[in-house]
Amino acid sequence: MGDAEKGKKIFIQKCAQCHTVEKTGKHKTGPNLWGLFGRKTGQAPGFSYTDANKSKGIVWGEDTLFEYLENPKKYIPGTKMIFAGIKKKNERLDLIAYLKKSTSE
């Protein structure tokens, strides 16, 4: 498992421009990520997803996020997420640790 404090820095640098994590957070260019773990792709209430995201049908968890965050457009062809991915394994683990902590109570 990664380091949530390091993951927070990665989130701020690479994700916060488009995403929020707080329970009352607003959608930005990307969806609010509160409740991410255990939710199916394309299911954040009130966010307009591509058909590719809605039909992917996987449930977000550590393993699926680990693979997705390496190369989002390869994992979900047709996603509108304009992020190249995080190639370093330890950075993905840190980010996932932060997301797990910050997107649930």
Swiss-Prot record:
Record-linked Gene3D superfamilies: Cytochrome c-like domain
Family, similarity comment: Belongs to the cytochrome c family.
MF terms in GO: electron transfer activity; heme binding; metal ion binding
Record-annotated membrane-spanning stretches: none
UniProtKB keywords: Acetylation, Electron transport, Heme, Iron, Metal-binding, Mitochondrion, Respiratory chain, Transport
GO cellular component annotations of the record: mitochondrial intermembrane space
Post-translational modification remark: Binds 1 heme c group covalently per subunit.
Gene name of the encoded protein: cycs-a
Primary role: Electron carrier protein. The oxidized form of the cytochrome c heme group can accept an electron from the heme group of the cytochrome c1 subunit of cytochrome reductase. Cytochrome c then transfers this electron to the cytochrome oxidase complex, the final protein carrier in the mitochondrial electron-transport chain.
Entry keyword Transport: yes
UniProt-listed InterPro entries: Cyt_c-like_dom, Cyt_c-like_dom_sf, Cyt_c_1A/1B
Name the UniProt record assigns to this protein: Cytochrome c, somatic A
Pfam families the record matches: Cytochrom_C
Chain residues that bind heme c: 15, 18-19, 81
Subcellular locations according to the entry: Mitochondrion intermembrane space
Any one of the GO BP annotations: mitochondrial electron transport, ubiquinol to cytochrome c
N-acetylglycine modification, residue list: 2
